[in-house]
UniProtKB/Swiss-Prot annotation:
It comes from Dictyostelium discoideum (Social amoeba). This is WD repeat-containing protein 3 homolog. Residues 912-942 have a biased composition (Basic and acidic residues). Belongs to the WD repeat WDR3/UTP12 family. The keyword Transmembrane helix does not apply. The keyword Nucleus applies.
Length: 942
């Protein structure tokens, strides 16, 4: 029988504050940001985590978050190209979209929140329908990562920017590019459009912010059709291109410019005969390089984010519209003030709500957030203040070492700037102490002190009660790479880059501040000189041996009592970064930078097994107490579970998004903790769920195969070179969903055949008592074939439906269309769903259907039935809409305020403060409205 092991699963994640962009909610009190594969919602006032949104099976990192304008929906983009929609009312997952083949870099909602536009590293833009949970279309044209997308809803246009240096303006109705703005010499890091949709600004890797005029409402056609139509012209490559540096401020091209010979411009598909956006001018900022621009919701402030520690605020001056053409952009955008942050600015965002326009949040590169509020002064100008700072819940840099207390109640972690102590129950940081670059750490016996070895060669002792450094000892000339407690708990042993192993005993000395107070200190007892730098140390549990890993790729075994040489373990091609000894002192495992793990016998030093374990350097190995199972961690971001007796790989854990530097094993072995370059600390618990090695290998093979389904390196077909395309993407889930439909169709065909045969038998047999009762297929759960197939198709996620139907072969199309005819005649079935499926299948198999005569009557009947059903649905919707309009007018008449007007509705108790003129005209207006309502009601009845 195959041996089953118990599975380790990730339980909790902490230490992360922000790894993606951050946004404010409508109230301005909550900050929403990505933390690894989770979305964290922080309470800015209390500085605590309010909510965490995630799915158990998500492994990809959150790369972008976006909130709808009304704050009802939250979209999160991931590094695997997927997008998830969450409800902000109950924090539940609403929809999942799969369409991108690279990380999602930017997203935006429309004003109603029913359309989402996303851009990705795969150079493509996809427009999604939130209501139907499906993709509308895909836009291609950029040659590098999409950096920003903006919707112009008043004119049905979409603006995109990319690292290829181009800004493209798309017509969302024709799904084609109508203008390409070129001339940026560097990648475009961001664009933004003001709330009035009259200004477009862009930023790149220089100190210039460039602006373009967008036609305003006054310049749009009076018939309400939006911007005047422009013909889309496929201009040859050598055609003239409008470049910002060669344009006059009035939008005309300079006479001496000759863009057709510009070497920076190639392979462009341009532009309409008349440009939609016209160059306006540019302003200069103090920073050498700019990485982001943002308008506030009220169009009062333009914020410019630099690549350093600065955010510049520009005040937008609003002039009379008649003089708009006469002013320059420098006069319109006036520098107001500069905000300097504590570390490098990573992202910047205003809130969506106009009421809180003066609040914004800055995501810093050091795993922290800062919330600001702009304060208006009485005499012009303005000031700002930091309203909240989130930095205590995580480290600013990599987590280099972890150590658990003896009772597993506390955890200590070190990084380049501090030592943090965590409560393992609440996962809150209870102590944060400034420290040099900590490379290793241990708890002193009693769990009242923490000992840290630093990169500068000192050993520092911290008292947890006072959160103070009580001792700092210059132990080594180089970095202290390893620090371990002696098995008798009387001292510690350190190994450093100065080729020395030093043995220290604990002692209590009088405090310098208070002579009566005793503090912990270390006294040197002996020193061991070795041939090379010491990288790792480990005592055997029986206190007989000390294993020392050296920079010369070997491991030396010494006797603990006499410090005499015992064995030398050699065979690694690169230095041994970590090692561990089993509790029974029989096995020693070594992990090296050569990506191999070796299992040795501690008695004779023989190598039991050597195997290629990871794809990068192995940083930590640790035995599970009282077993020969061990955990390894590597710079390839993976953690692996092994059996040292059978030399078997049991489980691979892919949880971190950066190099895994450290491990801490629980005292019983039922859990372990890992720390990583991504600044996260993760707890993995051992469950009662058995894991079978062979089944786990099969699952890994499926994941590898899925990764090849949409490979960016594959040949680009003619369809992929078109500007617009379908939004779906083939995944393992869509293939399995298509196979599920195919299995259901085959089962329904077999069951239908059995039912027909049974009915024939009933008709031909005189004595029906001799015929046994029909036994339906138990898999169908007592449903008819039609109902069973309907349920199976409806179970598929709407965003995966089209790709699942694409898997079906043409041989089952006749059966499927016959069921469509059956369903469309039933009132309980959704005609929209039937139409969507049938229309997609007809488009997919158009060539075969056009030459097949057997489908003609089926499709004709389906066409007629769908038209009739849609006509009925249209009549029902029209009647309901008219009835709702009538009810709405009645409410407005009776309650004296407009329906859905939140401000008037909330202030309905202040009706007596209204103008006297409106009260005098109330009766006349009511009579006129009643007459209009009666006329509309008669019209609707007809």
């Amino acid at each position: 029988m195959v041996k089953a092991y118990l599975k380790f699963v990730q339980d909790k994640v902490f230490g992360l504050i922000s790894t993606s962009n951050s946004i404010l909610d409508g109230s301005g009190k909550l900050a929403i940001t990505g933390c690894g594969e989770r979305i964290s919602i922080w309470d800015l006032r209390k500085q605590v985590l309010n909510q965490s949104l995630y799915e158990e099976d998500i492994k990809a990192e959150v790369t972008n978050v976006c909130l709808s304008k009304d704050g009802a929906l939250l979209a999160s983009g991931y590094s695997d190209g997927s997008i998830r929609i969450w409800s902000m009312s109950d924090y539940q997952l609403q929809a999942v979209f799969n369409g991108h083949r690279g990380s999602v870099t930017t997203m935006t909602f429309n004003r109603l929140g029913n359309i989402l536009v996303s851009g990705s590293k795969d150079t493509e833009v996809i427009v999604w329908d939130i209501i139907t949970e499906s993709g509308l279309f895909r836009l291609r044209g950029h040659r590098d990562q999409i950096t920003s997308v903006k919707l112009l809803e008043r004119s049905n246009h979409l603006i995109t920017s990319s690292k290829d240096g181009f800004i493209k303006i798309w017509d969302t109705e024709t799904q084609h590019c109508i203008q390409t703005i070129v001339g940026h010499r560097n990648p475009i890091w961001g664009i933004d459009v003001n709330p009035d949709e009259t200004r477009l600004c862009s930023c790149t890797s220089d100190n210039q912010i460039r602006f373009w005029r967008i036609p305003s409402n006054e310049r749009q056609r009076e018939d309400g059709s939006g911007i005047e139509p422009k013909f889309i012209v496929n201009t040859p490559i050598n055609s003239a291109v409008i470049i910002p540096d060669e344009i006059n401020e009035d939008g005309s091209k300079k006479e001496n410019s000759n863009n057709s010979n510009n070497n920076d411009i190639d392979d462009l598909e341009i532009i309409s005969e008349e440009e939609f956006a016209k160059y306006y001018g540019s302003i200069t900022v103090k920073a050498e390089s700019v990485s982001g621009v943002r308008f506030d919701p009220t169009n009062k402030i333009l914020a410019v984010q630099s690549t350093g520690k600065f955010v510049d605020l520009f005040k937008i001056t609003h002039y009379d519209t008649m003089k708009l053409e006469e002013i320059s952009i420098v006069e319109e955008m006036r520098h107001r003030q500069t905000i300097k942050t504590s570390s490098k600015v990573r992202f910047f965002s205003f809130g969506n709500d106009i009421k809180h326009w003066n609040k914004f949040v800055i995501t810093l590169a050091g795993n922290s957030l800062e919330a600001y509020e702009i304060k208006e002064k009485e005499q012009g100008g303005g000031a700002f203040e930091v309203s909240s700072t989130l930095d205590q819940a995580g480290h600013r840099s990599d987590i280099r070492s972890l150590s658990l207390s003896s009772n597993d109640q506390m955890l200590v972690s070190t990084s380049s700037e501090s030592v943090k102590v965590w409560n393992m129950k609440s996962l809150s940081c209870i102590r944060s102490i400034a420290c040099d670059y900590g490379l290793c750490t241990v708890f002193a016996p009693g769990n009242l002190h923490v000992i840290v070895g630093t990169k500068t060669g000192t050993i520092e002792v911290f008292e947890l009660a006072s959160a103070a450094r009580v001792a700092s000892i210059k132990a080594h000339e180089g970095s202290v790479w390893s620090l371990v407690l002696t098995p008798d708990l009387r001292g510690v042993t350190s190994g450093g880059a100065d080729k020395l192993v030093k043995f220290w005993d604990f002692e209590l000395i009088a405090s310098q501040e208070n002579s009566k107070h005793k503090v912990l200190n270390l006294s040197l007892t002996k020193t061991l000189k070795v041939e090379s730098d010491v990288l790792a140390l480990k005592y055997s549990a029986d206190n007989k041996f000390l294993a020392v890993s050296l920079l010369d790729n070997t491991v030396k075994i010494f006797y603990t009592d006499t410090v005499k040489f015992h064995l030398s373990l050699y065979g690694h091609k690169l230095p041994v970064m970590c090692l561990d000894i089993s509790d029974d002192s029989t096995l020693i495992i070594t992990g090296s930078a050569d990506k191999n793990i070796k299992i040795w016998g501690l008695d004779y030093g023989d190598c039991h097994k050597s195997f290629f374990a990871h794809d990068d350097s192995i940083m930590q190995v640790s035995f599970i107490p009282s077993t020969h199972h061990f955990i390894s961690a590597s710079k390839d971001k993976r953690i692996k579970y092994w059996d040292a007796d059978k030399f078997e790989h049991i489980q691979t854990i892919e949880a971190h998004h950066g190099e895994v530097w450290s491990l801490a094993m629980g005292s019983v072995g039922d859990f372990f903790i890992s720390g990583s370059h991504d600044r996260s600390i993760r707890i993995f618990n051992q469950t009662e769920t058995p894991i079978f090695v062979e089944s786990d290998r099969q699952r890994e093979m499926e994941q590898t195969w899925e990764a090849t389904l949409e490979d960016d390196t594959r040949m680009r077909t003619k369809e992929m070179l078109e500007e617009n395309a379908a939004a779906g993407k083939q995944t393992l889930e869509t293939i399995m969903a298509g196979e599920d439909i195919l299995d259901a169709i085959e089962l329904c065909v077999q069951e239908k055949f059995k039912i027909d045969e049974y009915e024939k038998l009933l008709k031909t047999t005189k004595n029906q008592d001799e015929i046994p009762l029909y036994q339906p297929n138990i898999i169908m759960l007592g449903l008819s074939p039609s109902e069973y197939l309907w349920n199976r198709i409806n179970r598929i996620r709407p965003s995966d439906l089209e790709e699942a139907l694409r898997v079906l072969p043409f041989s089952v199309m006749r059966t499927l269309f016959e069921y469509f005819n059956l369903w469309v005649d039933q009132s309980g079935k959704s005609v929209e769903f039937i139409f969507k499926c049938s229309f997609f299948l007809i488009q997919t198999h158009q060539n075969q259907l056009s030459v097949s005569t057997e489908f003609i009557p089926i499709l004709q009947h389906l066409n007629t039935s769908i038209k009739n059903r849609l006509q009925k649905e249209r009549f029902t919707l029209g009647f309901n809409r008219s009835a709702l309009s009538f009810v709405k007018r009645e409410i407005e008449i009776n309650q004296q305020y407009k329906f859905f007007d939140s401000d008037l509705y909330l202030n309905k108790n202040n009706k007596n403060n209204k103008d006297k003129d409106s009260n005098n005209n109330k009766k006349d207006n009511k009579k006129d409205n009643k007459k209009d309502n009666e006329k509309s009601l008669k019209r609707n009845r007809k």
